[in-house]
């Protein structure tokens, strides 16, 4: 009987240990004067996105969330890759400025924003070579050069994503990077993550994405 009670106590302790810690955080700030909509989405649960009231280009909301949640603020709830702000509740009060992109009160949110900005800066998306000629050969040459340049940029972007993950391997901010840039995770990066088996790969947003796929 004592052995059974001991096992049950151990299971209960484990459940308490792994249970996500809840935190209460106030998020406020300024938005663009013309902005009429602002959604708050927790861990990409867009079905339960919260439409925040805006008054005089300001907003304020207090929420209780998991300490490792990703809180996305945007006027378009279905577009995580282009989010204006992705916040991590590592403090009780976070303030954002929509016009300048500044975040106050959350060092983890700043760290994530910096990592995302660096990866996006090297994106080949939209890159092209202008051709001021009607010569088909010139067009073919430009297309080949453009494809080669885009591939080089993609490889560089992939290397930056890899280094970012290695530098932050124990931080769950990597979960958002993997979520937003799945195309960069193929091949070498995918093999690296399979080998590392980081705990953040069990984050709810990645589990949800795996279920969809």
Where are these regions (language model features)?
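Intrinsic low-complexity, intrinsically disordered segments enriched in polar/basic residues
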Residues: 2-5, 16, 114, 201, ...
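Amphipathic alpha-helical repeat scaffolds of TPR domains
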Residues: 132-136, 140, 169-180
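Intrinsically disordered, low-complexity regions
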Residues: 1-2, 20, 162, 170, ...
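A non-transmembrane, solvent-exposed segment enriched in polar/low-complexity residues
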Residues: 20-163
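Bacterial Sec-dependent N-terminal signal peptides
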Residues: 1-28
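Generic detector of low-complexity/intrinsically disordered segments
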Residues: 7-10, 14-16, 40, 53-54, ...
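Charged, long alpha-helical assembly modules
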Residues: 166, 173, 177-213
């Amino acid at each position: 009987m004592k052995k059974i009670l001991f096992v049950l106590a151990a299971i209960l302790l484990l459940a308490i240990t792994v249970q996500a810690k809840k935190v209460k955080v106030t998020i406020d700030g300024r938005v663009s004067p013309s902005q009429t909509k602002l959604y708050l989405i927790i861990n990409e649960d867009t079905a339960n996105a919260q439409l925040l009231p805006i008054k005089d280009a300001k907003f304020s909301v207090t929420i209780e969330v998991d300490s490792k949640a990703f809180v996305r603020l945007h006027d378009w709830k279905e577009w995580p890759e282009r989010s204006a702000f992705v916040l991590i509740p590592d403090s009780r009060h976070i303030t954002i400025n929509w016009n300048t992109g500044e975040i106050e009160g959350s060092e983890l949110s700043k760290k994530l924003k910096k990592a995302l900005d660096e990866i996006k800066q090297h994106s080949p998306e939209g890159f092209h070579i202008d051709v001021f000629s009607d010569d088909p050969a010139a067009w073919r040459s430009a297309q080949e050069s453009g494809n080669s340049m885009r591939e080089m940029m993609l490889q560089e972007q992939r290397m930056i994503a890899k280094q970012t993950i290695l530098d932050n391997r124990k931080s769950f901010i990597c979960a958002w990077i993997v979520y937003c840039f799945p195309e960069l995770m193929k091949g070498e990066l995918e093999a690296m993550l399979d080998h590392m088996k980081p705990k953040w790969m069990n984050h709810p947003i990645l589990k949800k994405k795996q279920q969809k796929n």
